[in-house]
Amino acid sequence: MSEYSLFTSESVSEGHPDKIADQISDAVLDAIIAQDKYARVACETLVKTGVAIIAGEVTTSAWVDLEELVRKVIIDIGYNSSDVGFDGATCAVMNIIGKQSVDIAQGVDRSKPEDQGAGDQGLMFGYASNETDVLMPAPICFSHRLVERQAEARKSGLLPWLRPDAKSQVTCRYENGRVVGIDAVVLSTQHNPEVSQKDLQEAVMELIVKHTLPAELLHKGTQYHINPTGNFIIGGPVGDCGLTGRKIIVDSYGGMARHGGGAFSGKDPSKVDRSAAYAGRYVAKNIVAAGLAERCEIQVSYAIGVAQPTSISINTFGTGKVSDDKIVQLVRECFDLRPYAITKMLDLLHPMYQETAAYGHFGRTPQQKTVGDDTFTTFTWERTDRAQALRDAAGL
């Protein structure tokens, strides 16, 4: 981080229209993969006033009542009345999902599972930094926590006049690669019309901002912008059209690391846009946890239908204890980054994805979860179980 003195990242709540779309797409994936682990799913969602549209390509033996599922996701988020502008119980739901192209299938499917080809060409990045306890950049961590707290305050009834749509933004000040302060906080939250701006700003400041952000990083010069435009009554899909895959920087590292451009939500693990990005995070986090570097960014790339990555590259930004070339060699020794091997390594064939679709895919805590008779661990790419093997291989 030494090249920046200030860095800003943003996040959005689960009620933001683009995040509604992401959560619907991943709910569809989860419902299908719960019945058919090897299904091929690519589900895109659009939400706008009074309508939710799901489209894409799915090949599966599962049967899911997709209309009911879409409605449940929308209602669970908090859009359950026309008073808030969008109602999952009464909105139109349109399903235009088709089957996966046979041309793609022939490039992915193999008689030997380990030879499974990548579902598309592309490049993916993973990143980790030791500036926070979860080895993530601080600005995106703090931004996620603000909107997560907003949802908690809304759903618990602590601030009952809050509505689902919200956005946050945090600017951190760095010195010698360490966060030394928060210079600016922006939080815009949708609300009921009866609450005054004064009451809203005071409550949000005390019960969301100060409750969430580390007090030692807030200072007399910190700027606070709470609903800076005034009223935010009209929000969600009424205020803006929502689409799957439009919050890829929110989903990843808040702009601190590069991004290959591929979105995550609605895609089964055969799509390397998702699985290889998760593997990239797993590799980078273990490198930092092992003490091989303070910061690490990995890029992997693939060709459609080919199992082995076409490239693996590492950048430790001058913080490495060994050379970047040596770390690439260690990665090749300790991690199998073929698509099938990633799926096996991270145990990805479970209905774990809707939870990833709000508040970031990275920096989360693995939890054991049971769906039906399937018990599994979520966020497996956040484990640091290969750090010691990397240290040993590096001779540290």
Curated annotation (Swiss-Prot):
- UniProt binding sites for ATP: 16, 165-167, 240, 246-247, 263, 267
Tell me which EC number(s) this protein carries.
Answer: 2.5.1.6
Cofactor: binding comment: Binds 2 divalent ions per subunit. Binds 1 potassium ion per subunit.
The broad enzyme category this protein falls into is transferase
Give me the residues that bind Mg(2+), please: 18
Q: Which UniProt keywords apply?
A: ATP-binding, Cytoplasm, Magnesium, Metal-binding, Nucleotide-binding, One-carbon metabolism, Potassium, Transferase
Name the principal localization, coarsely classed. cytoplasm
Q: Which NCBIfam families match?
A: metK (TIGR01034)
Write down the HAMAP family for this protein, in alphabetical order: S_AdoMet_synth1 (MF_00086)
Which protein, by its recorded name, is this? S-adenosylmethionine synthase
- Give the originating organism: Pseudomonas entomophila (strain L48)
Lineage in the entry? Bacteria, Pseudomonadati, Pseudomonadota, Gammaproteobacteria, Pseudomonadales
